Amino acid sequence: MILVTGATGKTGRHLTGELVRRGERVRAFVRNPAAAAAALGPEVEIVAGDIDRADTLAAAMSGVDRLYLLAPPSPGLARVEAGALEVARRAGVRRIVKHSAIDAGPAARSSIARLHAAGEQVLAASGLDYTILRGSMFMQNFLLFAESIAVAGEIRAPMRNGRCAFVDCVDLAAVAAAVLTEDGHHGRTYVVTGPEALSGEDAAARLSAALARPVRYVDCMPEETRALLRVQGSPEWMVADMLASIETLAAGEVDQVTDVVERVAGRPPRTFAVFARYAAPLLAAGAPS
């Protein structure tokens, strides 16, 4: 049995589907069981709980031998993951795959990336069979620009000349499924990226082609993005963290391209052009999801 935390998120929903296709028994650990059942289908067992509550997590891990660990971003991320690992150890879970960040490290600009680094250290010292997936920034994040693309034909962000090999969450899920179900990945840290490092202008050009109308990248000041995030209701720590992540991109620190998707999942990663084509209806309608 495989327990998937974050099962209704960008990666989790694709991961559960891929595991079901592989013939695995899958249990989804979620906050909203009704919504999860509708999204994930009848083949997935749904268990309600809170990853920050050891009692509900312990119940969900009964009979589980593999765990996909994705804690929600928060200032308590490292503490939550450490607690989950202890519950997993007591429950007899034998393999853990941790969802981490491409910029994870003790000196990262992003506080969440620093917390992921701390979580990686705890996992590595746990004695459990583990693999760490440092996923690049998602192509799906561009759906956040849906309204500005639909209304003004613009992507506004302070990316400067930075590049990133954005990854489709479908590809990260495919890698996670392979690592959870196949041997040979113990102790590995995989940086999971798309096939090309793109600038804001590159992304805009591919979106223009998919939408058959002009989309341009506008390099704005961080203060503009900060104000927008505040208006959208993001807590202050999240605003600061998102700006730190964008600054990491702008500084050229997440532009590496790896072959992990092809090597581990056994197929080429999706290009941004392919993502743009299937995202085009949402972007044209100004809908973020």
Task: Please provide the spans of the model-predicted regions.
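Conserved SAM-binding strand-loop segment of SAM-dependent methyltransferases
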Residues: E45-A48
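Oxidoreductase cofactor-interface core, primarily capturing Rossmann-like NAD(P)-dependent enzymes
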Residues: I2-P42, D52-V64, P73-A82, E86-R95, ...
